[in-house]
From Swiss-Prot:
It comes from Coffea arabica. The keyword Cell membrane does not apply. This is Cytochrome f. Residues 1-35 form the signal peptide. It comes from the Eukaryota.
Amino acid sequence: METRNIFSWIKEQITRSISVSLMIYIITRTAVSNAYPIFAQQGYENPREATGRIVCANCHLANKPVDIEVPQAVLPDTVFEAVVRIPYDKQLKQVLANGKKGGLNVGAVLILPEGFELAPPDRISPEIKEKIGNLSFQSYRPNKKNILVIGPIPGQKYSEITFPILSPDPATKKDVHFLKYPIYVGGNRGRGQIYPDGSKSNNTVYNATGAGIVSKIIRKEKGGYEITITDTDGRQVVDIIPPGPELLVSEGEYIKLDQPLTSNPNVGGFGQGDAEIVLQDPLRVQGLLFFLASVILAQIFLVLKKKQFEKVQLAEMNF
């Protein structure tokens, strides 16, 4: 009886340990996955505001270029490439969260027309798969398959991103029509300057929150500074500078309100662009080809008829 109780106790302890380990794993994985690929997913139902501005610009304050290339027209139920280019100087290094320097990551959001979506793996050709590499795309929301996001990914390798897109078929999707549609893209390189909660990252300028004399500068053990500013009335304010930005002021210096205390370490930025694509009706294409063929045949018959007429005229003149 006692032996059976011991086995029951051991079984209970093992079950608890497995449950706790599983919970820790799930929580850790969730924290990591929720942090990426794009912070905007956490706070915005739609990444494109009514003004046309993509919300990534709220955190990535510097304006940088981005380019998108898509076919001029596609047929229904066809896989095509949408190529997003995020150019930047590969020699640049950014300030990481720990204050050290490292390579820049890139990320992108692609806003497709309703009905367009990420192509399933079995529909993607080997040529496109080779261009995609090991990239993994995801929908912005489970119910928004036409909005795709990716990142952060190493910019050194993926400053050009190929999205495999499947066009819709109006024959099976009644809300889709043969029209010209807009496509919007946003792309960033490097870390943002502001977090979604409004707090600053260490990849931006820090300004003085008061005017006065810099009475004390304490360099923290793990990096960063604690700057004490004393005004003319003897009141003090303390500004905390995280590791990363370079300090521009020194003790005894008089500074003004909102004067930069640090350099701007940001070397990245965000850009957005757009393109247009036509969902082409196959019957319209066939009709166009038939029309062109008939025009060419008419021209040929006209030339032949003209030569025949010239021969008749020449024969009559000789007669």
